[in-house]
């Protein structure tokens, strides 16, 4: 497990439309999946929920997900040189970042989620995500360093945006909870 980092945290979701509020970035696709909304099963709106899930459908992927502002590959799919510094590099053939587990803590309560997208508003903030930077590079809007899904926000009772703490955890250390009902392996 890594040390907790404190940051402004905002809510985003699969299928979120592009608006001024999110710098005109739509979330029908993710950094790794051009068909994220289809593979997820639909729009994961924070409205009309049934428990931790959207009321209209059961997701095909984990509804507890986050975005962090680093991608190990560039836009052409080539491994970035700095990605070789990611803890665990070379230990397996899978992605270094996608599906990785994150613990988010808010007012003494923890929630666990899988890393499913890159952001908020950046893909090259290695020092924030894996290094010793105390805050993210993001200078836009609230200067958030973490985006969380509606299920994650709901579990933690975060209504819009707030300050949370986060850290990476190994899958074997993730406790049972609603975040383990559907685990994303793609």
Language model region names:
Residues 1-186:
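Secreted/periplasmic proteins
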């Amino acid at each position: 497990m890594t040390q907790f980092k404190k940051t402004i945290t905002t809510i985003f979701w699969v299928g979120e439309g592009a608006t001024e509020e999110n710098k005109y970035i739509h979330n029908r696709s993710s950094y790794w999946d051009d068909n994220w909304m289809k593979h997820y099963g639909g729009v994961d709106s924070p409205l009309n929920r049934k428990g931790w899930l959207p009321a209209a459908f059961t997701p095909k992927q984990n509804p507890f997900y986050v975005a962090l502002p680093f991608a190990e590959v560039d836009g052409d799919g080539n491994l970035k040189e700095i990605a070789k510094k990611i803890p665990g590099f070379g230990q397996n053939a899978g992605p270094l970042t996608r599906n990785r587990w994150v613990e988010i803590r808010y007012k003494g309560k923890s929630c666990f989620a899988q890393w499913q997208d890159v952001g908020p508003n950046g893909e090259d903030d290695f020092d924030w995500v894996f290094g010793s930077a105390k805050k993210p590079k993001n200078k836009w809007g609230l200067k958030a360093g973490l985006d969380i899904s509606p299920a994650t926000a709901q579990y933690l009772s975060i209504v819009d945006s707030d300050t949370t703490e986060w850290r990476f955890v190994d899958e074997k250390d993730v406790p049972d909870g609603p975040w383990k009902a559907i685990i994303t392996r793609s």
